[in-house]
């Protein structure tokens, strides 16, 4: 998600966008007299009557924001199609194999480093992911609550087809332009070490240092950049991120990748997955979507070298909380946190494991289920992460084995009356060996940018995006999707944004009855394309915002359709679906 505007009330928070929405809707109603009936009549079709006003408001909102966008000028980030160059792209393995090479073994290297400079107060840094009213919408970094890391694994299947690198950053998102810049720094190294791909993900924490530029010193930079764009003076626009910090950021990730490759050890890979139930996940702001991925998916790499540290790779679909959010009357909301992901890693580290993390399809799906006493906002994600970490360690254990292990069975927090012991009724799952087969394919995709808010944001140059111009005001964002096969049965889709779970596994919002536009989604789900056990790695090699079904897309600015304001546009999901169909051909 590009941004979330939040304020707190007592010990909770609500979206400040409600206030903004009320103001916008007041303006809309002034301009919309007589327009709603006409629009509703034209587009009603199978739409429910209750949805007609929302659809009409969405049309009006797009029109009004579109008028603002029309007044803004393109900058050097907008490149005509004939001049467009997409460099530093890796295609993956040249060929796919179905059998492991004779005598082949997995090889994995791991590294993890902090992305927080020791002298962080000397930089111009802000928390990426929310703006707080009590902090004048500028959450400058003043303290470090835990850490912000990049975790890296280098993985090779022994087939001679090269090593794939995967890096996950504790941040709101890393834009494709920055990712390709990091790849560029590693071009020679990649050739020398036969790297077939370099893939960079984000955990999507909302309390990390802003690595995109949207959550900057908005009172200073936003007005200046907007005015400069309107006056066609793009050279006067200010970068959203701190340039010196970004150089530090690039260098740390580059070094971590090199360290992971250098530390590769041969060993065995196993896989286990367990459904932990809906208690630990909840749909916060996309009620039309009904699918929920409630599984923990764990890869465990055990090196042959007994002195080397094993590595756990975890995939789960839970949007991080806002660990650094201002709470109460004290001066806070300025703390960097890796959110629940950091505390999963802390727990696995105590048990003797390295940790790697991939988020899943997280559009609207937040953490929940753990109830412990909290003094600060960060305590909630910490409690959640530590408990999830213990579950990850226990996938193949019985309830009796867990109870006998004090580390696993003892809570790391003071439980409230509502707390339910996580291992009650726990049953183990079977762990299977993963044959050393790693196929990976990446593909460039052009997404048409129909959302005027995103077009305008690109023009004010706060985010590092390269926009392809195919015609007059015909804008596209070129990014990547990916497909991975591990062993003979595990299939993974790499998605460059916050993916609606219905689009992965099927759900009500794909149907005419369950969608706001009253028609079926015309694309295929990931299950349709790859099979029912497909795994999603989200925010992969880009952070393009929300990806929601075309038939459930309307920019009405209300709570149920908040995601549309931060989506590239109405055809993003169908474009993605078609691209995934192509990638498996």
Identify the residue ranges that each predicted region occupies.
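Short, Lys/Arg-enriched N-terminal segments with co-localized hydrophobic residues
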Residues: 1-15
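Bacterial N-terminal signal peptides that target proteins for export
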Residues: 16-24
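Hydrophobic alpha-helical targeting segments used for export or membrane insertion
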Residues: 25-29
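Hydrophobic alpha-helical membrane context
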Residues: 30-31, 216
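Sec-dependent signal peptide cleavage junction
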Residues: 31-43
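Conserved beta-alpha junction segments in alpha/beta enzyme cores
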Residues: 42-201, 205-383, 396, 406-585
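Glycan-recognition surfaces in beta-rich domains, encompassing non-catalytic CBMs
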Residues: 392
